[in-house]
Amino acid sequence: MKQHTLAEAIAHTGVGLHSGVSTHVRILPADAGSGRYFVRVDLPDSPTIPAQVAVVSQTVLSTQLGGGETGVRTVEHLLAALAGMGVDNARIEIDGPEIPLLDGSAQEWVTSIAEVGLVAQAVTNNLASFDIQEPIWIHQDDAFVAAIPASETRFSYGIDFDLPAIGNQWYSWSLTTEPDTSFAQEIAPARTFGLLHQIEYLQKSGLIKGGSLDNALICGPDGWVNPPLRFANEPVRHKILDLVGDLSLLGYFPRAHFLAYKASHNLHIQLAQRILALSN
C-alpha cells in the first residue's frame, strides 16, 4: 500500500475540552515515512511530538502525548480523522496545549481533509501488513479490550450505562475498500458525550473547562439535555472514534478484530502498547 499525505494544508481554531484554552491547529503535508507528528509552534525551538504510543503521558478522559509544558492533550479525535481518512504523514502545528474540541466529533476535520484531498507517496507502508496471530485480552474489572486474528481490520465496541437514554449499545465498523467514505459517514460525526451528574465533580477536578452544550452531548435521568442525536447509537459510535484515534498511535492498523467493552483511553493505550511489543 502506498502512503498518503494531504494535498494542501488545512486549519481549525477552537477551545480545548479540558483546558478551556483556544488554540489554532494547522495541518500540513509531510514527507513520506515521516508519520503524523505535532509541533508546538508557541514554544521556543518549536518542539516536535510524534503521534506514537511511546510518548503517551496520560489518559484521564483524553489522551495526551508528551509531558510537562511541551505536551499536547486530547489528540484522539484529530488523529482518528487523519487515520480514518488515510493520511499517513502529516505535520500538525499547534499554538497551545490542547487540540480544539470543535463540535465534539471528528466531522470538521474530516470535511476539511476531504475538501483538499490526498496525494499518494512513493514509500510503501510495510507495517500495514502486520497481522495479529494470537488473541490479546486486557481486563479491568468488567471492562476489557482485545485484538483477535481476523481477515479484515474491524472495530467493535460495547457500552452499558444505567441511564435509559443510553443503556446498552453495541456497534461494529470495519475498514473497507473506501475507508474514507465509510469513516466520514459512520464514525466521524459521532460526538463526545457526558453524564449530567458527573459534570460538577469533573469541573471541580479541573477538567472539562471548555465543555459546553455546543461541543458535547449531555445525558441525564430524563434523557438527553441537548438533542437531537445524529445517530440513535451516537455514544457507542463515538467510543469507536476514540478507539480508532488511540490505536492510530501505532502508525498503522494491523489486520485484526479490535473489541472493547466499557473501556477507557487507558485500556485503549494498553492494547496499543501490547500490539507494539508484539510487532517488534
Curated annotation (Swiss-Prot):
EC number: 3.5.1.108
Active site: 265
Binding positions for Zn(2+) per the UniProt entry: 77, 238, 242
Cofactor dependency: Zn(2+)
Family the entry assigns: Belongs to the LpxC family.
Name of this chain's protein: UDP-3-O-acyl-N-acetylglucosamine deacetylase
Family annotation (HAMAP family): LpxC
Function: Catalyzes the hydrolysis of UDP-3-O-myristoyl-N-acetylglucosamine to form UDP-3-O-myristoylglucosamine and acetate, the committed step in lipid A biosynthesis.
GO BP annotations, alphabetical order: lipid A biosynthetic process
Molecular-function annotations in GO: metal ion binding; UDP-3-O-acyl-N-acetylglucosamine deacetylase activity
Pathway recorded for this protein: Glycolipid biosynthesis; lipid IV(A) biosynthesis; lipid IV(A) from (3R)-3-hydroxytetradecanoyl-[acyl-carrier-protein] and UDP-N-acetyl-alpha-D-glucosamine: step 2/6
UniProt KW keywords: Hydrolase, Lipid A biosynthesis, Lipid biosynthesis, Lipid metabolism, Metal-binding, Zinc
Organism: Nostoc sp. (strain PCC 7120 / SAG 25.82 / UTEX 2576)
Gene Ontology cellular component list: membrane
Catalytic reactions on record: a UDP-3-O-[(3R)-3-hydroxyacyl]-N-acetyl-alpha-D-glucosamine + H2O = a UDP-3-O-[(3R)-3-hydroxyacyl]-alpha-D-glucosamine + acetate
PANTHER family linked to this entry: UDP-3-O-ACYL-N-ACETYLGLUCOSAMINE DEACETYLASE 1, MITOCHONDRIAL-RELATED
One Pfam family of this chain: LpxC
